[in-house]
């Protein structure tokens, strides 16, 4: 689970940015922007996309419950198409991408409304628009991994060179209400495809399952856990989506569902594994009161 904070040399500091909690049914988000009008744009888009998804699930209830890849990628609604592509790429059900996909739609709506910075945290699945060309600085996203040894840490993510929306998504088998068939403390994915980041985080968390450690020494537990971490990371490293459909915003790089795993982190207890391009670790004040959750 992660939580956002931000630094910005342009003067739009964390104190000046607006942070608002919003809940609609199961969707519980934290929205960050420089102006309240962009917050409203995100809320409207969340309601719109939830309605599209609910109508589709009403017509085909199995879509909302299956844990397996969806065999046919629908052309519309777009939220369902993107969720299906992401779930299929990760080898799991399409609902594994719901939080990240909704977050990415909300951020795209904020950008269309004129936002120069936008962030939506949907229960640890975060979509971000933070380009350097808009005067933005680095963003610090904290890590909350329950009772693991990795406390008061975060990632310092530099502003993007391109005007894109990217994802930082987290799954946990020990923290939060989301479904996980593993018991990792935190499985974190970085990707320019937010839906893929969400599904891949779920798949990575599922891939780490440890049991029967009662009779092992501490050294044996550590060695076994590290091997399981490495195995799980190897299972997800080649996930990718290649989508040729023109993006709905008319600006494909901004809000594309296409992407690969740019980086991944898996944490269990005092053990950690990292692959790919992962931002710098920094000390962070990870406050429970600002982590996105039901109230």
Locate each region found by the language model.
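General beta-strand structural signal in soluble alpha/beta enzymes
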Residues: 93-99, 116-122, 128, 143, ...
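RNase III-family endoribonuclease catalytic core
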Residues: 102-139
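Short, Gly/Pro- and small/polar-rich lid/capping loops
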Residues: 1-9
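Short acidic-hydrophobic catalytic motif
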Residues: 2, 44, 188
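Short amphipathic alpha-helical segments
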Residues: 38-45, 49, 98, 102, ...
């Amino acid at each position: 689970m992660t939580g956002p904070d931000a630094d910005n040399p342009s003067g739009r500091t964390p104190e000046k940015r607006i942070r608002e909690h919003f809940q609609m049914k199961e969707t519980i988000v934290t929205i960050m922007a420089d102006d309240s009008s962009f917050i409203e744009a995100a809320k409207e888009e969340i309601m719109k996309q939830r309605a599209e998804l609910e109508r589709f699930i009403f017509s085909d209830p199995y879509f909302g419950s299956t844990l397996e890849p969806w065999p046919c990628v629908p052309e519309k609604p777009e939220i369902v198409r993107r969720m299906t592509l992401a779930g299929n790429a990760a080898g799991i059900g399409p609902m594994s991408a719901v939080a990240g996909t909704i977050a990415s739609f909300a951020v795209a709506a904020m950008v269309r409304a004129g936002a120069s910075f936008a962030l939506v945290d949907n229960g640890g699945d975060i979509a971000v628009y933070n380009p350097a060309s808009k005067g933005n600085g680095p963003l610090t996203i904290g890590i909350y991994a329950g009772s693991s040894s990795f406390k008061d840490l975060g990632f310092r993510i530099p502003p993007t060179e391109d005007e894109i929306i990217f994802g930082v998504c987290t799954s946990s088998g020990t923290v939060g209400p989301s479904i996980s068939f593993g018991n990792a403390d935190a499985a974190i994915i970085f990707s320019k495809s937010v839906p893929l980041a969400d599904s891949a985080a779920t798949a990575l968390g599922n891939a780490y399952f440890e049991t029967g450690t009662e009779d092992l020494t501490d050294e044996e537990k550590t060695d076994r856990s590290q091997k399981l971490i490495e195995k799980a990371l190897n299972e997800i490293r080649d996930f990718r989506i290649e989508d040729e459909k023109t993006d709905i915003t008319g600006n494909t790089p901004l809000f594309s569902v296409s992407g690969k795993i740019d980086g991944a982190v898996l944490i269990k207890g005092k053990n950690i594994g990292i692959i790919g391009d992962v931002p710098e670790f920094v000390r962070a004040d990870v406050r429970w009161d600002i982590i996105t959750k039901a109230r």
